[in-house]
């Protein structure tokens, strides 16, 4: 049992000073500061003084290569697996794992096993079936069955389009993957969403827009990611988001380099531009591409080198939104809490609310992490 007292709550909406009572893995009571007395609780109840601190939902990183990524420059360039400690120390209490370019050296069986392991270790973890490639490599004999029968699988991804590393799928092939994923979600009560990797081809979101325009499949079944890869793609993504589509920014710890070399759009600037254009803030998310390779290629497609994505970028991007572009904290923090929870149908996640999972971050006034709570247990303390 934990009692957090007199803390300024962003749920993500600003609630002001509150007392928050946690029993086991749930938030059971939220009252005005001073309303929940410590008297009468068990002596072992942990009391946390929240004076001068902020409380937010635990962060949701919706795109992490938990098995590691890379390999695009050869076997020596494979990146390491994610660890629970490596995620929670950056405030991530919920992770969604995926495969990328390599769907052979890493497979869905191993991804599901890794996801189960992270859950058993004390955080919340989900995953996608598939990888860049179409036809999709699944654990069972179909996308629908994977989503229906494997608890951890919530959709398909990351399917690559507009990229030289994709399978160059036809419109019909791409639409069928999204249709099957939707049916799997409908039958299982899950999101049934397709996480779509966008490359730097001028075709941008063409295939996605055709699915939305030419079929009965709603835009809510698709989450395009890496939308800030370059200015051209970002401009198209604003247009897509204005039509109601959800969009996912990829955070970056080395944005000063990528902004110059690759025309990448800085997350805080991109979100500000979207908000100014009238995009619904609820349709915007940020993910890290954690443990994924960040390959660099020459103009003729030659591999030049590789970096590794880090979940640390989530809070860094939120800070830049708040302190550089003056986006309200409740909007900035929703991109890594309530928005991904709603878009991915992660029940009882993403909010500081009675009955929700006790996944929480305590921060100071400079938005530095002080403590992280996952499933009611402290998993990081400064």
Task: List PLM regions with ranges.
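His/Asp/Glu-enriched, well-ordered alpha-helical/loop segment
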Residues: 276-356, 360-363
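Active-site core of metal-dependent hydrolases
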Residues: 180-295, 303-304
